[in-house]
Amino acid sequence: MTSGVNSYASAVDDDFAKMKTLIGKWTGTLEWSTGDKPETLNLDYSVRSNGSAILEESNQGGVEMLTIFNVQNDKLQSTHYCGLKNKPVSYLISSTNGVMKFKTDIEGSGIDKSKESFVISWTIGLIEGEKDKFNYEYKVHNPDGTIVTRTAVMKRMI
């Protein structure tokens, strides 16, 4: 018999292993919920730190950013070094059928949501039977309370 903690830790490890299937270079067209002009999004995933971290290097319309995914204290987290000049730390809040949703810990990230825009959530949607495509979405919270959603279907380059 396994304890609930061990079962949860195992599920988190499974989700981290699923993320490792993204290793490689990806490209897609980022659409905006505002109707703004779409732009190219390039992602490059690599495993780092003796297998304990996944590095996502992104280039969105010429703006480079980094996100590091790792398991800490039995939680899958991401730390995003953003072009908006802040550092949202997010935690996996759900994982169902390959769709992993992360939500930013606003207070823990030191973000003042009344003064700055920041990424409030990410969704990485693995597609069953498709190793060369996945859905990518993130939402930006603005100081006025509006949320802008950006989505792309990512296709493997290498």
Question: For each predicted feature, which ranges?
Answer:
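Edge beta-strand at a domain terminus
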Residues: 94-97, 133-158
